[in-house]
UniProtKB/Swiss-Prot annotation:
This is Polyribonucleotide nucleotidyltransferase. One of its GO terms (cellular component) is cytosol. It comes from Shigella dysenteriae serotype 1 (strain Sd197). It is an enzyme of class 2 (transferase). Mg(2+) binds at residues 486, 492. The lineage of its organism: Bacteria, Pseudomonadati, Pseudomonadota, Gammaproteobacteria, Enterobacterales.
Amino acid sequence: MLNPIVRKFQYGQHTVTLETGMMARQATAAVMVSMDDTAVFVTVVGQKKAKPGQDFFPLTVNYQERTYAAGRIPGSFFRREGRPSEGETLIARLIDRPIRPLFPEGFVNEVQVIATVVSVNPQVNPDIVAMIGASAALSLSGIPFNGPIGAARVGYINDQYVLNPTQDELKESKLDLVVAGTEAAVLMVESEAELLSEDQMLGAVVFGHEQQQVVIQNINELVKEAGKPRWDWQPEPVNEALNARVAALAEARLSDAYRITDKQERYAQVDVIKSETIATLLAEDETLDENELGEILHAIEKNVVRSRVLAGEPRIDGREKDMIRGLDVRTGVLPRTHGSALFTRGETQALVTATLGTARDAQVLDELMGERTDTFLFHYNFPPYSVGETGIVGSPKRREIGHGRLAKRGVLAVMPDMDKFPYTVRVVSEITESNGSSSMASVCGASLALMDAGVPIKAAVAGIAMGLVKEGDNYVVLSDILGDEDHLGDMDFKVAGSRDGISALQMDIKIEGITKEIMQVALNQAKGARLHILGVMEQAINAPRGDISEFAPRIHTIKINPDKIKDVIGKGGSVIRALTEETGTTIEIEDDGTVKIAATDGEKAKHAIRRIEEITAEIEVGRVYTGKVTRIVDFGAFVAIGGGKEGLVHISQIADKRVEKVTDYLLMGQEVPVKVLEVDRQGRIRLSIKEATEQSQPAAAPEAPAAEQGE
């Protein structure tokens, strides 16, 4: 019999329901989590035995949105969901990051978490719901997991923190921050902000962590009712004698190797030491496991680097804890791009470009919450050569998507509004060298490239990555971490912003016990580093260029009467198509009558504006126009007077004498002056050549142009 176990609780302004025991009973654990009609079904499956020779933890997190959740059918050719979207990939990473550190050291059994959005309230984002579901399912499963975790979104509206704001509230918020953690400590932060202070950001993290305790309490209560027995898993016993033998052979040599400041030289020396140590030990005892020896050597490496930092000694590359690596900043490095910059910090380098396009180049995103248009695109590429390796080059991986989104968040707060700068902007960061914090180098490079392109950003922005080494109560916060310090340390803490405040904060913590005080030290140290980098950047370019690149499209905006839009577009788009072909421009018309003309040549834009003004001009009775004969009939001729408007010249209005045959006076395509006699209620226009000729050239006969044309 199906016997669901349900817990319901209030979480901010929303009601959360946790339900288990009803569905997917063959999975290790399954939970349906709902928050005000947004429901996510989360399953966990764990393998009881690890694969032989497995030397890493194979955790997979899949997050998938089903369009039926929003009452829609997919718009793809096959009418079903396909590969994960960028948004789905980012939420999968959001779930993965806080749960991964909570599995015990040495646990290498395969675990898969699948979160499926099955119902959605447009006001409630499913990401927090999915994170709560993953935490609950893992806690129920019996898999060794040191959770549960809570998750919260924090907004900042009218100088007040708001817990789990709705989508409408987020539009008014100066902050969008997601925080996840255990009962005791924060594990992950992901945020974007409108240049808030360090204290405001830290306050949001603390607020979110305090508020999510109700989630943790309710998951614990659910586990008491429905949790499966904890797996009888024990880590492999430590071979103290082997550890001591490996340390005797390698520790001193590794300590010396980690004094080599050049990354490639250091890596080469470390590889030699590891290979020689393993070869020596296998020669002594061929029954030893090479993977186990590699793990022991890695632990020694970690200890060497960490103990040196905690003792106050210089870091791997000889710097003090708060020193920034050498900076090299250049702009305008690519001749035909709209904006470009090369930003180098130590052995991390980013070649960043900015490209300007029209509204037609904006990305239309068909999301579960509805369709939206994105006019600021940020793409991050991490080729294998950047770390001296070979590899597959193809579509972006999860890491590239995540780093690109973080860099975008760092820049978004200073981007101009579309009404002030009506361009779609694409920034691409090519990581050409990498040794720590390439995403923050991308933020710095993007700021420089945008200013080089003449984009009127509100302020320059820079980013910095901080690290942490902590043993007991002793800790050291490191500025501008290397790749090794990230890998061997306890925290990856990235901060981007301007001189006025923070635009993005991302934090991933690998240990428990990170206090508010440690985060405060990290934020303050990051501010000093950010201001230093901005100072160097400002020496290269301190304000956006006064004009955009000669190779960029120039957008000219004019306003027309909304009633005239149909005239500019024409039947089936015929007029606007002809206009774009005739003038060589791109023309976009909005419902309010705003017309945007984009062209790389100013004369072409002027021509297009002139033609649109002709089309939309009101026909004035009594005014003389130059028109072109488009049709000849027995009773007169139809003459186009611009703007797609056509009027009739009656046979009696062609000349000041009796006309027997229209073609004696007019030819197809002939240009003639015409005077507007009348515009009736149906918009029909009555014209006169006779009166126009009398008004401008009283002596000229109307048949003269025809005679000239016929010679």
